[in-house]
Amino acid sequence: MPQLNGGGGDDLGANDELISFKDEGEQEEKISENVSSERDLDEVKSSLVNESENNSSSSDSEQTDRRPRPRPDLESYEKQREYFAEALRRQQDGGFFKGPPYAGYPFLMIPDITNPYLSNGSLSPSTRTYLQMKWPLLDVPASAALKDSRSPTPGHLSNKVPVVQHPHHVHPLTPLITYSNEHFSPGTPPSHLSPEILDPKTGIPRTPHPSELSPYYPLSPGAVGQIPHPLGWLVPQQGQHMYSIPPGGFRHPYPALAMNASMSSLVSSRFSPHMVPHPPHGLHQTGIPHPAIVSPAIKQEPNGESPSNSTHGKPSVPVKKEEEKKPHIKKPLNAFMLYMKEMRAKVVAECTLKESAAINQILGRRWHSLSREEQAKYYELARKERQLHSQLYPGWSARDNYGKRKKRKRDCKSDSPSESNFSPQPKKQCVPYLSSEKMCDSPTSSHGSMLDSPATPSAALASPAAPAATHSEQAQPLSLTTKPEGRAHHNHPHFPLPGKSSGSGSGSSMALHSLSRPIPFTSLPPSLLGPNSPFHQAALHSHHALLQTQPLSLVTKSVE
């Protein structure tokens, strides 16, 4: 293989120098050149046949202008093609890939990337390893460089690999042309907007001939303009040439897009095999789809998995539906229910009340006011009702309905976890890790504001409902706690006062077993701070209740 001699300049060789490929695919290239020359002859013949058929069927001048002019001999055609090949070689000095002498070359010619024309930037070692694994024809050293002087805006990857972009005026059947980036006439519209096909040799628009759509390119009816790029492994398109293009392929207007991720991310496993349809031949598909095109399919994957996850919970649903399909057999009506059924319409007509409870009360009073003889009539009707019910449903029992009702209650309880299952015992174990000094630092927002006013604590805490509130409100943010010693043996705690507890030693010893609250004492009048005040008594009462159940806020603060 030819190696780079110097620092990788642009002028390492002549512009018109032909590079010899000493590659593993050299024999394939010779065979493919013969095949391509035969294909060129077939194209000339088919175009002549095409033109003669169209001229005989239609004399429209516009249509004849779109067809290629008849070539009298093959020599002028060969000169024209060689002229384009020479111009292309001079134009892409330092280009990424050199166009082959045959523009209709059906196979992908991968050149030697170590040729002296490649400069400015290099493949990373990880990319080089991947290329060697995937495409054994490429031997890419770390100093090999990639450059396309003609690409208007090469999209650079994160690993300094420039991505060659197609111009907009590119032949739509790009797999028929190996990577030749030649511009066609400026007046021609883009290939994805024009219905006709541009001739790769002359740039003259014409309609495709069936002979061009060879078995190498089995096309679907609407995918002529969306054939993927022949360098599908570098420019991320859906398929690779020589592979079938399904009708649901990725339809993007431009055949090449700037890659927005590194090569390693393109070849990563996140492109699952089901995103890219496999060719029917069983050939290995090396085309990697573009991330911007595949992203809708990736976004749909979690949605596609959700039905499979939801099916795990569905087997229980048919069981419930089967139970609901069973007819609910009501038990036979008793005497009072028969009386209500008969008299309810009369009571509703007499009274303006619409509530069912009030109507039932009126019917109950009237039932009790009836004499034995009047009630006996309804008891007889109830007996007949039971007999008829036993004939219709011989194996029926009232326990069936009650069992269903209990099952429904159990299902409702299992669906909604109850908060009453929290036991206060594990909460007390977290108390020794708390300090009362930290508790009293900042009063809480909701209850602290409630306790700021002098009248509110005495009224709220002295009421009999105060201890019940401490039981029910388990998540109250009051920082209430007891010292571990006081929780064990202290039964009559004293409410601490800032002045008195600091004055005497007995007061300080009692403060160890005291209840600490974030209550601003400055906002309370002195009458509420006395030992006989209702505020003090209510605090002691709530403290006894607190020794039994401690609020949830103590547990959460210990975790922090």
From Swiss-Prot:
The keyword DNA-binding applies. Residues 303-313, 415-426, 473-482 have a biased composition (Polar residues). Residues 1-11 have a biased composition (Gly residues). It comes from the Eukaryota. PROSITE patterns: HMG_BOX_2. Coiled coil: none annotated. Residues 329-397 bind DNA. One of its GO terms (biological process) is negative regulation of canonical Wnt signaling pathway. Its main location: nucleus. The keyword Cytoplasm does not apply. Keywords: Activator, Developmental protein, DNA-binding, Nucleus, Repressor, Transcription, Transcription regulation, Wnt signaling pathway. It is found in: Nucleus. Residues 19-45, 63-77 have a biased composition (Basic and acidic residues). One of its GO terms (molecular function) is RNA polymerase II cis-regulatory region sequence-specific DNA binding. Residues 46-61, 453-472 have a biased composition (Low complexity). GO terms for cellular component: beta-catenin-TCF complex; chromatin; nucleus. PANTHER family: TRANSCRIPTION FACTOR 7 FAMILY MEMBER, TRANSCRIPTION FACTOR 7-LIKE 1. Belongs to the TCF/LEF family. Interacts with tle3a/gro2. Participates in the Wnt signaling pathway. Probably binds to DNA and acts as a repressor in the absence of ctnnb1, and possibly as an activator in its presence. Required early in development for dorsal specific gene activation and during gastrulation for repression of dorsal-specific genes in the marginal zone. Required for head formation and forebrain specification. Regulates anterior-posterior patterning in the neuroectoderm by repressing posterior neural fates. This is Transcription factor 7-like 1-A. It comes from Danio rerio (Zebrafish). The gene is tcf7l1a.
